[in-house]
Amino acid sequence: MAEIINQIPGYEKGRVQRINATDEVSESFIVAQMAADLRKKWNTSVLCISLDGHKEAIESLIPQEKAVGTVYVLDQKNPEFEVVLRKAEGIINRRFVRALIISGAERLTTRTFKEKPEKGREWIDHRLNGLSGGIGLPIILVEVHEESIEVQS
């Protein structure tokens, strides 16, 4: 799993990046490791938002070592994207948060954009680019992509 973290293209400020996980366990692990890594490298706080109810799993995987920043984990089950965005902006503005990691973002688009998932991804990227570009915040979306099996007839 550590190899996955090392392969992530740098944490670029002001940019939305997508990372694919193989299952929900690896998704939580990636979020926790990235949050701990960012907290240690930048000496700052990180906000993690779990859109699929994995708050406890993420919190248990974050190393409890002494660091300057704090990792905040927000749990949002079956949320509306606008509500999540508003809550994230509130926390970012009140605390010294300089990175945002969202797990389960693809679940938001599958409900709204069932027929056109690519359009949903573009919509989310557009909304998050506005948040990240204004204050130079890196936003990382961790998503689960199961391998689709094609049935030949």
Name each model feature, range by range:
Residues 14, 95, 135:
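Structured loop/turn residues at beta-strand edges in well-structured enzyme cores
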Residues 122, 126-153:
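Phosphate-binding/switch region of NTP-binding enzymes
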Residues 1-66, 86:
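The Walker A/P-loop phosphate-binding site
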Residues 1-2, 94-97, 148-153:
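C-terminal regions of RecA-like/P-loop NTPase motor modules
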Residues 42-123:
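Conserved inter-motif catalytic segment of the P-loop NTP-binding fold
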Residues 35-36, 88-89, 125-129:
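Short amphipathic alpha-helical segments and helix-helix/interface helices
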